[in-house]
C-alpha cells in the first residue's frame, strides 16, 4: 500500500511513499525480430528468420508478485504471430507439390485455392526480476532487470478461404507434413524501465528490451520442405536468437490509497 501522511496545522505537508508488496497482472504488446540461427545437421532455410517474414507481433499476459525489496517473481504467457498475416517465405520453392508460380494452390477439379500461411508460436516462461530504484520519491519504480525461461512451440498455420475450392493437401492431417511444428525451450534476458504511480492504479507501465535464445526440435514424424531437402523425419536441432521490444500495462492489486490527517 502507498501511504500519504499529511501534517497541515501549521501549513506544512509531509508526503511519504512506501514500497509495495503486491500481486500484479499485466498485459503487453511488442515486436519480435529473429536473428541468426543454426541447424545441428547443417540444413539451411529452416530457422525462424528463414521461414517467416519479420517482424512478429508478440502479445502476452503476465502475473507477478513484487516484494518490498524490489524483487519480482512471475509467469509470462505469450503468443507470437506474423505481423503481415501471410509471411511463410518461398512457399513455391518449399512446397512445389502444393503451390505453383503466383503462389496459388491446386484445389479440387484443378481450380485455384486461396491459402494464407503464417507462423504462430506460444511460450510459457516463469521468471525473476529486480527493480533498481532511480526516482528518490518513488521507490517502486526504476531500472528493471529480468531473467525468464521455459517452454515454447511454433508452427505454420494454413488458413483456407472457404469461399474458394479447398486444397486437400493442406487440410486435416495432410497439413502436418508442411507445418514445421517444433517444441523447445527458451531463455530470455530483459532490461528496461518500470514505473508504478504513487497516485493511480492505472498509470503503471514498463518498457523492456528482450533478448532470447531458443532451442527446438521437430515434433512431426515426417516433414516436407524442398528448400531444406526434407522428405522424412527432421532429426536435427534448431537454435534461434530473438530480439524484441514490448510495452506493458500493469495493474497492481494494492487496495485503496490511504490518507492520514493530524490536527494539533
What are these regions (language model features)?
Residues 66-70, 80, 133-135, 196-202, ...:
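Outer-membrane beta-barrel channels and translocator barrels
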Residues 36-52, 82-121, 154-184, 218-226, ...:
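Extracellular/periplasm-exposed beta-strand and loop segments of Gram-negative cell-envelope proteins
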Amino acid at each position: 500500500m502507498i501511504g500519504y501522511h499529511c501534517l497541515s496545522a501549521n501549513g506544512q505537508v509531509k508526503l511519504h511513499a512506501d514500497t509495495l508488496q503486491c500481486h500484479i497482472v499485466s498485459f503487453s504488446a511488442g515486436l519480435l525480430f529473429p536473428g541468426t540461427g543454426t541447424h545441428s545437421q547443417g540444413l539451411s532455410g529452416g530457422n525462424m528468420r528463414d521461414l517467416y517474414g519479420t517482424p512478429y507481433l508478440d502479445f502476452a499476459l503476465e502475473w507477478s508478485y513484487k516484494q518490498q525489496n524490489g524483487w519480482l517473481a512471475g509467469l509470462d504467457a505469450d503468443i507470437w504471430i506474423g505481423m503481415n498475416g501471410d509471411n511463410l517465405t518461398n512457399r513455391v520453392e518449399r512446397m512445389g507439390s502444393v503451390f505453383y508460380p503466383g503462389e496459388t494452390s491446386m484445389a479440387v477439379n484443378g481450380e485455384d485455392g486461396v491459402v494464407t500461411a503464417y507462423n504462430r508460436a506460444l511460450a510459457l516462461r516463469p521468471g525473476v526480476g529486480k527493480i533498481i530504484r532511480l526516482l528518490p520519491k518513488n521507490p517502486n519504480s526504476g531500472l528493471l532487470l529480468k531473467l525468464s525461461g521455459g517452454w515454447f512451440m511454433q508452427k505454420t498455420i494454413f488458413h483456407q478461404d472457404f469461399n474458394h475450392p479447398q486444397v486437400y493437401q493442406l487440410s486435416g492431417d495432410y497439413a502436418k507434413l508442411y507445418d514445421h511444428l517444433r517444441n523447445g525451450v527458451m531463455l530470455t534476458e530483459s532490461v528496461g524501465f518500470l514505473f508504478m504511480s504513487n497516485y493511480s492504479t492505472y498509470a503503471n507501465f514498463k518498457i523492456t528490451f528482450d533478448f532470447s535464445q531458443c532451442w527446438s526440435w521437430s515434433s512431426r514424424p515426417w516433414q516436407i520442405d524442398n528448400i531444406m531437402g526434407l522428405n522424412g523425419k527432421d532429426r536435427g536441432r534448431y537454435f534461434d536468437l530473438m530480439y524484441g521490444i514490448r510495452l506493458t500495462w500493469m495493474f497492481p492489486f494494492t487496495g485503496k490509497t490511504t490518507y492520514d490527517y493530524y490536527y494539533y
